[in-house]
């Protein structure tokens, strides 16, 4: 044992520091500055600052004698044992079973048992201490220091085990992808069939709902509903609806309310698909508020209660719906020439679509044929003068299939058709200043300004 530890380089302080310094605090601090070549042999306990011996004269003999005294001390086997336990605690993997070195073999509890066994064995053979009290104090302090290191290493291992356990538990509870992998192990084929069937049924149901909504809107306003291009974009967009739902489900955090849902809703959420009832409710709200498809916070809360989803899921669904459903309808309307102005969130112009069951600005009801509608003095209605008798529009109306008048932007000052929309038929713009009737002046003074509000 002594030869083994003599060859190891784990004790640089023991080789470079005389043992007599551990009995006196002042002596210990003073001797820490001496190098290996200046070490003095082991001496008496009452000495002060030791005078180092000249190099090469008895230094090797003194070091060897000090090492022999340390290796021959009764407590040295216990010191070597706790040192090995500290090494095992830092270089070996942890295992609670203790089936290999590095498990509970290097724990502090096992070291307590080793101390008891060692003390029992040593007392029967020889005393625990030697005749040198300074060496005894050195051995006891070294064992205590290593004991403290072992306790701290055990605390670090406990913290690591606790963190790993909590991290794995958090991953299992927060990530639905783990649940999807578990489901695929047993029923991957059935899940794929259910997913395909739900996509097909959702697409068919959405198309039928759109047709019913189209017929209802046409009967109410006397105008056709969305064009075939809009329906094509609707049905073509249903295939991407499932991907949006999956993104929303993964992005939304799970809450404790999931425990109160039934098994079917849990299964649907595991696969990232919203229930059909929830999708239909949000889609119905979207088409009822096409003029302003931005639900307020209260409306989001109400929709979340009606659909059984979270507010974040409802919000994400409407973001995707505005991008994938509303925007293609607007683009199709602009391409086919049904709307004179691009879409704005306030619903200033949506082409030939009827929104919220009210007449659109561009649709002409029975009444004056030269103006875009029979506006009344409502708080949201803008003032407008009436043209003189015999006035006919200078721009021919649209085809009978569309049946809506020119855009309101034609009545704004600066528009290319502004002068022709104000002047009577057959008049030219250069007659505007020289030949104005009172009715023309009234009409010119009360042009519509939709940007005033």
Curated annotation (Swiss-Prot):
Write out the annotated subcellular location. Answer: Nucleus
Q: Which residues form the MEIS N-terminal domain?
A: 102-185
Q: Which GO terms describe its molecular function?
A: DNA binding; DNA-binding transcription activator activity, RNA polymerase II-specific
Key word Magnesium present: no
Iron listed as a keyword = no
According to the entry, DNA is bound by residues in 267-329
Q: Coiled-coil segments, which residues?
A: none
Q: In which tissues is it expressed?
A: In early-mid neurula stages, expressed in a single stripe in the neural plate. By neurula/early-tailbud stages, expression is localized to rhombomeres r2, r3 and r4 and the anterior spinal cord. Some ventral expression was also detected in posterior rhombomeres. Not expressed in rhombomere r1.
Q: Which GO terms describe its cellular component?
A: cytoplasm; nucleus
Example GO biological process term? anterior/posterior pattern specification
Output the PROSITE patterns linked to this UniProt entry: HOMEOBOX_2
Q: Where is this region: Disordered?
A: 37-60, 206-272
Q: Provide the family line.
A: Belongs to the TALE/MEIS homeobox family.
Q: What is this protein called?
A: Homeobox protein meis3-A
Q: Which organism is it from?
A: Xenopus laevis
Phylogenetic classification of the source organism: Eukaryota, Metazoa, Chordata, Craniata, Vertebrata
Q: Tell me the name of the encoding gene.
A: meis3-a
